[in-house]
């Protein structure tokens, strides 16, 4: 999972690599259409026409689809949950809070967050390996407040699903050397449950190619650390051009693997933390 600072990003931004900025008029037009659609949904909801409401949402999927390339550009083309490009299949614009119906842990259904169907702050990029299994799954902690259109309180809900636009949620994730996504050491029981349920529902460990790719990244970084330490030892007694060149080579490769745009950069960073090589850790501080 990679943190996306969605709150402070707009399609009009001109500093997003690989993205051609929208004009302010384009963005204003998109927001205006969103507002119109939500007003129409509200009228259908008030009239008790839930099926028509949901049909209107489905009929306008192209509206959130218009933001897909911008959302992908924010992560360098990576899925926000798996942090890979092709291994997690093609990408969907996923609604963090389900738009039509929401399911609890036991499968019980409640009405969805239809008023957020066209709210870009509810959009995430997810490969369909995970998105198809997630569906409307959105359980809340027992006793949590539950937002409704008449009593909105999304900020006070306690969802199981980890959110890539919440830096605190992203910080709950760690990895092991076998490529498995695990809870961060020292996490509370509730935090561990959130990680476990998110991993299970989005197939973040079950999808074998993804776990194998993580293991490969871990092994690459682990080998680079060994090379770095061996070269550093050779330099300890004085000048050694070959060893010095090796240090520079390793540093360059570590920078590449831990760069935000790299696939599974969070795995590479965590491996460095686990191995606790101070000089290499400085490269990603």
List each model region and its residues.
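A boundary/linker detector
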Residues: 1-65, 87, 281-285
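C-terminal, charged low-complexity interaction regions
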Residues: 5, 183-285
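Acidic, metal/cofactor-coordinating or nucleic-acid-engaging core segments within structured domains
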Residues: 132-137, 141, 167-168, 202-216
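Long, low-complexity, intrinsically disordered segments enriched in glycines and aromatic residues
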Residues: 141-188
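Short, charged surface segments at domain edges that flank catalytic/cofactor-binding sites
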Residues: 32-78, 102-117, 121, 144
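A general structural signal for short secondary-structure junctions and capping/turn motifs
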Residues: 69-72, 83, 115-118, 152-153, ...
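Generic beta-strand structural signal
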Residues: 77, 114, 121-125, 158, ...
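Histidine-centered nuclease catalytic patch
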Residues: 84-129, 133-150
């Amino acid at each position: 999972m990679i943190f996306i600072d969605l709150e402070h990003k707009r399609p009009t931004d001109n500093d997003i690599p690989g993205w051609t900025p929208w004009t302010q008029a384009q963005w204003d037009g998109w927001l205006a259409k969103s507002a119109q659609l939500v007003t129409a949904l509200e009228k259908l909801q008030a009239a008790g026409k839930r099926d028509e409401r949901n049909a209107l949402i489905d009929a306008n999927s192209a509206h959130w689809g218009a933001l897909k390339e911008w959302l992908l550009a924010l992560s360098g083309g990576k899925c926000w949950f798996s942090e890979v490009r092709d291994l997690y299949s093609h990408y969907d614009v996923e609604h963090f809070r389900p738009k039509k119906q929401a399911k609890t842990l036991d499968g019980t259904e409640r009405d969805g967050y239809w008023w957020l169907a066209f709210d870009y702050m509810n959009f995430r990029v997810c490969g369909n390996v995970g998105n198809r299994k997630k569906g409307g799954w959105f359980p809340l902690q027992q006793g949590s407040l539950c937002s409704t259109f008449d009593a909105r309180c999304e900020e006070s809900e306690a969802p199981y699903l980890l959110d890539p636009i919440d830096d605190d949620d992203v910080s709950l994730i760690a990895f092991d050397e076998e490529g498995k996504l695990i809870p961060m050491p020292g996490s509370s029981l509730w935090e561990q449950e959130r990680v476990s349920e998110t991993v299970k529902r989005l197939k973040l460990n079950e999808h074998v190619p993804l776990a194998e790719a993580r293991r490969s990244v871990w092994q690459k970084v682990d080998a680079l650390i060994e090379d770095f330490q061996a070269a550093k030892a050779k330099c300890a007694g004085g000048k050694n051009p070959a060893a010095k060149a090796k240090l520079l080579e390793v540093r360059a490769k570590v920078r590449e693997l831990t760069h935000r745009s790299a696939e599974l950069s969070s795995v590479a960073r965590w491996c460095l933390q686990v191995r606790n090589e101070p000089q290499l850790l400085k490269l990603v501080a």
